[in-house]
Amino acid sequence: LTTTSQNAHYLRFFSQDADINLTSLYANPAGSAFLNKGWHISASAMTAMQSRNITATNPAYLLNADGLTSANGTRTFEGDVFAPVIPSFDFAYVQDKWSVSAHFGVVAGGGTCEFENGISPLESLVAGLAYTNGLPGYTLDSYMKGKQNYFGLQVGGTYKILDNLSAYVGVRGVLASCAYN
C-alpha cells in the first residue's frame, strides 16, 4: 500500500509544509508556535483500498498449463489491498513563545496485499527451471501475502523567535513492521 500522507487531513490540503495547523505537525512542526495558547489534540483515521498489478513477460511462462499466460508470454499478477484504519495522532501544548508537540501515525505502508496467484519473481524461477530442463510444461500453485506498516513518532519543542519566525528541535523515528508469506 502506498500512503505517505501522515494524516487524513493531508488528503484535503497537500501543501502542509506551509500550513499552520495541528494536523501539519509532521510536515511543519515549527508552525505549532503560532497556534493559540493551550492544549491541541487531533486524532484522525483513513481507510485505503488499492490494487497492484504486476505485468511480466517471459517466454517460459508459455509452459504454464493454467491458461493465464497470453500468446506472447505475458502474465499479470494481481494484488489487492484493504486497510480499514490508518491512524494518526497529534498533540501540542502552546505557551506565549514556546510549544511542545508530538506526532504518531502510520507514515508509510499501512496495509496487507495479497497476490492470489503469486508474484512474477517466484513464477520466473519455476518457469526458468522448466524451460532450461526441456520440460513440456509446469503447474504452480503460488500465493504471496505481504504486510508493511511504518509507524512514525516525532517529539520536540518550538520557540517563537519573532512574530513570524520560529525554530523547532526534535527527534523523529520510524519503526518498520513488515511480514511476507
Name what the model sees in each region:
Residues 1-20, 84-181:
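Outer-membrane beta-barrel porins/channels
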